[in-house]
Amino acid sequence: MKKIALFTALLTLGIAVNAQTLNVQSAMTDLKRGYLNKAKAAIDKACTHEDTKEDAKTWYYAGLIYSMIGDAATDPNSKYKKYKDLDPDWCEKAYNAAMRCKELDKTDGYDLKYIFSKVGSSYYNKSIELFNTGNYQDALTNSDKAAKVLNNSGDPDLANESIYISGYCCQMLKDNEGVKKYYGPLVRKNKIKDDFKPRMQHVYTVMYGIYKEQKDTANVIKTAERYTKVMPEDPSANLLLANAYVWTGNKSKAVELAQKAEDETRNTPGYAKWLCAVAGIYEQTGDFATAEAKFKESSTLEPNQLEANSGMATMLFKRAYEKDQAISNLGYSEEDEVISKKLTEERNAFLNQAIDYLKNAIKYVDALDANGQAQHRADLYNCLRTLNTCYITLEMYDESKPIKARIDQIEAGAN
């Protein structure tokens, strides 16, 4: 009698275990037949039952099913599109399931790349959507998840894109340490695919600026040198390194690199713009005559442009400011009065020249269409402010009034 009771108990236990195993099998079958609702119901039971929740297979199919729900939710052409609203949290659940499967799968018997790819792409797309609406913190959360997931999916290209977005989010959040965290590994890469190079131009420039702001001379040079090594075909790399050498006092090396950039771009369609960048290097080294010659050559090649006009205006304004600083350091002796008068005349001459170039720059932006004006709004604002300062310094108050009104209008629109 006892043997019969024991046999019955074991039989009952076996049926219970098999019933739970059948939940996984049922989920697999329903998934193959396209019944996502039934597959989800079956796998959810298996994921919480004691007998199947520690089985890697359970979590593999959970990840797969939730990925299919994601396919229905994100692809209007999906054969599962009628299930698009089946579970709005499909992405998080698919990710958690895949990670649980990875944890339990001691033999790497399950290929999770599809699940990770689907989840990673979803996080990435969400991060772009949030970034474009200005929600940088939530965009960062999603792009960070995307990078981690996509590294598991075997998609390094989209993982790099996600890391780039993470760094850009930190930049918009003014979190320099966050930028360094994400952009640092990108800077250290030795090979960059062509379609990612425009991103890397931004990465190198931003990292250079952060290190310069932090007065980290070693990393300023290292970042610029890495740029020239990894992307030697990009003249911007030589110009960035030239700027680094100016900053560290090596003016001869800076000029050498500026000349190299000029030679590399001489026969390119954008040569006039490159000349302005080269002129900026000469200006920083104190060779104002060569800088002016480069700006004017650029204007001759392309008369209707912003860069040469704003570049010349900025250089002249800086030279006027230097004269002003020298005036402020003088005393009240007769000799100082003579020097002050001479310096004031030189300052005013620079300001009057700057005014003409600033007017041309403003005229250029004003002639653009709405999109062009929006893109150059910051340039316009800076030109207007500089022009207004020129007028005030020269006591040209009537000329200042309409310029100040435009500045106020721009500032009001930004608030």
Give the location of each predicted region.
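Structural register within alpha-helical repeat arrays
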Residues: 26, 62, 69, 119, ...
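Residue-level recognition of tetratricopeptide repeat
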Residues: 53-55, 159, 193, 200, ...
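Start-of-domain marker
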Residues: 20-74
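TPR alpha-solenoid repeat register
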Residues: 56-58, 155-156, 162, 196, ...
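Short coil/linker segments at helix-helix boundaries
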Residues: 65-133, 151-157, 191-192, 198, ...
